[in-house]
Amino acid sequence: MADLSRRRVFTGAVALAGAATIGLNPVAAAQATRQRTGAQHSPSLNFGDYPVVARVRARRALEHLRVLSDKIGPRIAGTEGELRAKDYIARVLRDLRYQVTLQPFKIADKFLGSVRVGKDTWQTGSSPQGLQDATREGVVIDVGDGSAIPADVTGKIVFIAAVTNVADAYLTAAQRGAAAVLLGRIGADPLRRLSAFSPTLPTPVTIPVLGLAQVQAERLRARLAKGTVTVKVSSVQHKNLTSYNVIAERPATFHNPDNKVVMVTAHYDSVPGSPGANDDGSGTVLCLELARVLRYLPTNKAIRFALWGSEEYGLIGSRHYVSQLSEPDIKRITGTFQNDMVATAYDPAHIYWLLSVDGANNATTQAVAAAAKRLGYEPRTKGPVARGSSDHVPFHEKGVPAANFSWRGEGGLALLEPTYHTPEDTIADNISLERLQVSLELIGAAAYDLLRH
């Protein structure tokens, strides 16, 4: 088919899609053309923007996030939480009629713990140098920074928490009879809350040693201030683990002789103790909502969604995926839109950053910048600027146009929400529907623009 004829057919197809999505729905049409909160001007949409912008709904995405963050909770690489999330994501994408592939890969053991306090259970890290696969129950004794541990703490759960490094005091507690040790970290910087961790101990001990997040340490100390507290602690070494990438694709509507594809991606795992609402449940549900919206729209390229496992342990899932691609496969990818932390409610993180590894423009950053201009969001965006640390990196290293898109502070890329990587990264405390909607519109419009051309 001649290029001009193909364009006419494509334009007609988009028109039909637009009619189906907004032409018969005055409310949706009005929403597509209204000026957004925080936008500089009313949108000046191109023809392909309408069927995307009129249909994406942050509230639909939120329903997926309630499953991932509230119901499943922490999604640690290779463990039950990540596997449940994998199954949910795959089921949603299959129901949307995508061709779904699960890509397994082996990962290292994970050392996790739990603390049962009354009716609450907190997930923590546990030390590989402590006793594993063990449960201990006892009265908690708070020894502050561990500099003055009583001579006899037999059978007690010794709690050590301070701003300074508290790891060394564990050995004294173990030698004096502690049943288990809880190490808490209290951050000196009020803008950076500290996460649960797996303590590295210079000398192994034969009791469980758990690493608490800052908020867990604070909550435990608050309970202790009211009286005696009894807890049940457990340590588990998760062995022989397999993590998964979830890949979903639909072919181009029209002849695609070069088999070109546009990728929209996010990671679905989280760090220990964190339900990962923003990091990166938000990016994951953005992908699921865009998969719904884009599934029937006419395209000149294939659309591929990829949800990565094991990002939090070194981009393992995306690196594995890229390592399995042939050179022709790599050259077929027009662009990779990575979405990592796209909905924080933290007020100072009001800039939507375009983050390429080298700080240079590429097809993805240009498409998002153009979409921001059309939608009136240009003043809320910055970049591209140089930043790695997410799943766009392996693609960039192979020459694929790729970038990460994320809400962060205006003062710098490191200005993330204080609840980053903590148990406080919840829907209630750290999700903005308005910012999620902006992210959906920007990535949806940008990705569809690449898919159409």
Give the ranges of each region predicted by the language model.
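Noncatalytic luminal/extracellular "stalk/propeptide" segments of secretory-pathway proteins
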Residues: P43-F47, P51-I157, A167-D168
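Metal-dependent peptidase/peptidase-like ectodomains
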Residues: V56, P298-T299, W308-A414
